[in-house]
UniProtKB/Swiss-Prot annotation:
Family: Belongs to the complex I subunit 2 family.
The name this protein goes by in its record: NAD(P)H-quinone oxidoreductase subunit 2 A, chloroplastic
Principal location class: plastid
Keywords recorded for this protein, A-Z: Chloroplast, Membrane, NAD, NADP, Plastid, Plastoquinone, Quinone, Thylakoid, Translocase, Transmembrane, Transmembrane helix, Transport
GO molecular function, one term: NADH dehydrogenase (ubiquinone) activity
Subcellular location: Plastid, Chloroplast thylakoid membrane
Organism: Panax ginseng
PANTHER family (UniProt xref): NADH DEHYDROGENASE
Length: 510
């Protein structure tokens, strides 16, 4: 009799849980329609991989790219809709979150054609690679819309686990295995630090997990200026710092950049920063609203260290990917200026604008590196000497992307930095802006040093790698060149038409 009653209770509880889940999916599912498209693409890839003996490779790329483009389209159709909170407060939809989701989808859409020839040359498993990229994209999108501590922790873990697997995708490469191990160990440590900070925030607010409810809880418990909040701030800053990779949380970045497959590095170099920036703005601005002076000071220190160390150490590098790793550390210092300025003085608008340009500049540079690496088998900066004599198009594309990264006019990078520094100056961050200007000049030096190597025309200085340079026989090299052309155009043309881009960025609601 007791067993019968317990069994009935179990069935009733299971039915209630199922009905609640169905209700959430039915009424809130439309708010995550772009994410649902990616999930459908993932399921389709798995079905094709498990049912087909001979994998139709073009179809796999087509399904992945189409799901990303359709997800972008769904986001654009939803633009300007009223902000909504769904899934019992776990997820928030507004223009601010959606523009970061758009940037992540844009990165992934450009990275897939960039990876085609590399995967064919290295004979890596194609389906798993695409699954990891789409799953990481999905995790990044959920992180952008996360509205509670649990989702903010689980979503980046979804992204991070796929990142670890992608960085170690070339299993026979010793450098790749070493990079993966460092990435995994430091990522696990940073996640534990982050969740420890969340526990302090959870306890201080009286057991709240939603971001806005945490603020209300801190007011009710009178804990908004307590030492516990300062401890939470320090731990959370360290945890998020690993994802953004500013100095001194940058130790993993050069090794992962150098050891991982180049298309993977291109993907991680932009998507991780976009997703982490979206999360950082919400965490610092909402739960730590009463500690703005403290987190401003912490971020200013990180920005200064990143801009100085990143650009100075980049000068000494001999590997192109390690140089870009330290360059990215310097670039995140500029982005942090926008986070500090905040919603006032167009800080977030300038950060979003600069990140859009940074995506095109960085991916364009990596597309050139992928092509050069496949045709020569080297990553050494000195081996680029004389590339202009063999492949003027590739050399000019790389030069334009590097000049845009350095911030030379009239390229997009110049206008992005100008807008970002102007907003910082208007907010009174004079010292940060001056450091940013000086380190930008330093970055121009090492970018110009590479461009000078590219344009060498004397035979005695041309390296054997360039002398024996051959175009790839693979049919898919057009896909890399397509990504490269799109990124090069986006790195140059938007600088002339900044106003529409700034207007869209300013239209985001936080």
């Amino acid at each position: 009799m007791i067993w019968h009653v317990q069994n009935e209770n179990f069935i009733l509880d299971s039915t209630r849980i199922f009905m609640k889940a169905f209700h959430l999916l039915l009424f809130d599912g439309s708010l995550i329609f772009p994410e649902c498209i990616l999930i459908f693409g993932l399921i389709l890839l798995l079905m094709i991989d498990s049912t087909s003996d001979q994998k139709d490779i073009p179809w796999l790329y087509f399904i992945s790219s189409t799901s990303l483009v359709m997800s972008i389209t769904a986001l654009l159709f939803r633009w300007r809709e009223e902000p909504m909170i769904s899934f019992s407060g776990n997820f928030q939809t507004n223009n601010f979150n959606e523009i970061f989701q758009f940037l992540i989808l844009l990165c992934s859409t450009l990275c897939i054609p960039l990876s085609v020839e590399y995967i064919e040359c290295t004979e890596m498993a194609i389906t798993e690679f695409l699954l990891f990229v789409l799953t990481a994209t999905l995790g990044g999108m959920f992180l952008c819309g996360a509205n509670d501590l649990i989702t903010i922790f689980v979503a980046p873990e979804c992204f991070s686990l796929c990142s670890y697997l992608l960085s170690g995708y070339t299993k026979k490469d010793v450098r790749s295995n070493e990079a993966t191990m460092k990435y995994l160990l430091m990522g696990g440590a940073s996640s534990s630090i982050l969740v420890h900070g969340f526990s302090w925030l959870y306890g201080s607010s009286g057991g709240e997990i939603e971001l806005q409810e945490i603020v209300n809880g801190l007011i009710n418990t009178q804990m908004y200026n307590s030492p516990g909040i300062s401890i939470a701030l320090i731990f959370i800053t360290v945890g998020i710092g690993f994802k953004l990779s500013p100095a001194p949380s940058h130790q993993w970045t050069p090794d992962v950049y150098e050891g991982s497959p180049t298309p993977v590095v291109a993907f991680l170099s932009v998507t991780s920063k976009v997703a982490a920036s979206a999360s950082a703005t919400r965490i610092f601005d909402i739960p730590f609203y009463f500690s703005s002076n403290e987190w401003h000071l912490l971020l200013e220190i990180l920005a200064i260290l990143s801009m100085i160390l990143g650009n100075l150490i980049a000068i000494t590098q001999t590997s192109m990917k390690r140089m870009l790793a330290y360059s990215s550390i310097g670039q995140i210092g500029y982005v942090i200026i926008g986070i500090i300025v905040g919603d006032s003085n167009d800080g977030y608008a300038s950060m979003i604008t600069y990140m859009l340009f940074y995506i095109s500049m960085n991916l364009g540079t990596f597309a050139c590196i992928v092509l050069f690496g496949l045709r020569t088998g080297t990553d050494n900066i000195r081996d680029y000497a004389g590339l202009y004599t063999k492949d003027p198009f590739l050399a000019l594309s790389l030069a334009l992307c590097l000049l845009s990264l350095g911030g030379l006019p009239p390229l997009a990078g110049f206008f992005g930095k100008l807008y970002l520094f102007w907003c910082g100056w208007q907010a009174g961050l004079y010292f940060l802006v001056l450091i940013g200007l000086l380190t930008s000049v330093v970055s121009i030096y090492y970018y110009l040093k590479i461009i000078k190597l590219l344009m060498i025309g004397r035979n005695q200085e041309i390296t054997p790698h360039v002398r024996n340079y051959r175009r790839s026989p693979f049919r898919s090299n057009n896909s890399i060149e397509l990504s490269m052309i799109v990124c090069v155009i986006a790195s140059t043309i938007p600088g002339i038409s900044m106003n529409p881009i700034i207007a869209i960025a300013q239209d985001t609601l936080f």
